[in-house]
Design a protein with these regions (language model features):
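One-carbon transfer enzymes
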Residues: 1-168
């Protein structure tokens, strides 16, 4: 859907599969991280973009990349909230017994998920349909639930659903 929307607006779209890049170079991706960023920067340079959007990028952007272009990152947490993937964020929210979460758009910097905030929204994750799920968690061991149910845990699923409803 995102690709179609970008095309509909006549915007240039640059994609470079990190999975294919990894497979083409044996060994840990960390060994090729800067090479990948360089390839992305080279792909973008022909467009001379005013701004780039890291939609679904799911990689930590290196410093040289952050300095080369203004990069908007979509992050599934409030400013100064949990960092990491959406899955990591949800587990951190559960572990800390958070009452709210959210999503933000921020400028990517070398300080992962902490760049200047452009916009954000807040999502309540307590009371209402969440109350019983938090009460259930209070009666059980989170480590055991996480091991046995993982992302299928009802509270995890409900938080994801609440966040997903607000994603573009």
């Amino acid at each position: 859907q995102y690709f179609a929307l970008v095309q509909e607006y006549g915007l240039p779209l640059v994609t470079l599969s990190s999975a294919k890049f990894r497979r083409a170079r044996n060994g840990p991706f960390a060994n090729h991280r800067e090479d990948y960023d360089l390839r992305v920067r080279d792909s973008l340079s022909r467009f001379n973009p005013d701004i780039c959007v890291l939609a679904g990028y799911m990689l930590i952007v290196g410093g040289a990349m952050c300095r080369a272009y203004p990069l908007l990152n979509l992050h599934p947490a409030l400013p100064q909230g949990p960092i990491g993937t959406w899955q990591e964020v949800i587990w951190q929210l559960i572990e800390s017994r958070s009452t709210h979460t959210g999503a933000m758009v921020h400028l990517a910097t070398e300080d992962v998920d902490r760049g200047p905030v452009v916009s954000y929204c807040t999502v309540p994750i307590s009371g209402g349909s969440f109350a019983g799920l938090w009460e259930e968690l209070d009666r059980q061991d989170l480590a055991r639930l996480r091991e046995e149910q993982g992302e299928e845990m009802p509270l995890f699923q409900r938080i994801r659903q609440a966040e997903y409803q607000r994603e573009p």
